[in-house]
Amino acid sequence: ENSLENKNYNLTRKILKNFKEEDEIYYWYKLKKMYQIIYNEEGTDQALNYIEAKFNKYTNPSIKILYDMANIYQNSKKFDESIKYYSKILQKINKNSETYADVLYKRGSSYERLGDNENSDKDLLKSLSIKPNDPYVLNYLGYGWLERGYKIKDAIDMLDKAYNQRQNDPFIIDSVGWGYFLIGDYVNAEIFLRKAIQLMPGDPIINDHYGDVLWKLNRKMQAKYYWQSSFNSKETEEELKKKIKIKLLKGLDKV
């Protein structure tokens, strides 16, 4: 682990050679670490080609391996593929278990990224019926509803419930702040979004949100600073960059 974190990939490869194919758990661990090395050295496509070729050799992969592959596809923005494997897992596990709720959450988030709000809501609400206080599902669903302008009061209630459990989670704090922004309470929005950006200063979405609320509070030079930070981030998706570019040139009201 340390050699991988320190980017000493040659040492990591030497260590991983000791993991034999006969031991499925440790061998799969080796394959995942090799996937990470290839991802860091050569990029997403080459890493996916590697792990897919290895995964396809398994005739009866364990639930753990299926879950890892589903997550790899989700992190690679191959959401259709991730849904396929999350669905396979759901067919194999107890429908009342916390694990079932967790996988529903993951599948629901993939549906949401595809714009399939109907199936996303269905999975997330089902997950909450099993684990009604899960702060991350409450946050994800509440934030999604706010973005869609759907059931605003219920969405804010969910975010408050999540925040009461995770008061130092920057993503949950950002969601609460954004909720205040969307209902026009810019003073409270600024308080929460400022706290979120202090905890996660490099996150492009939090920077963008904080820029928006500063603009509404007529702190326009500061707003442009945070928009620019978001625009410059390597993690910022192209669609968001397009919106930020307009904001930097013409202001928030033109988006």
Regions found by a protein language model. Give the residues of each.
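Canonical tetratricopeptide repeat
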Residues: 33, 68, 106, 140, ...
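Terminal, low-structured helical/coil segments at or just beyond the last alpha-helical repeat
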Residues: 209, 216-255
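TPR alpha-solenoid repeat register
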Residues: 26-30, 65, 99, 103, ...
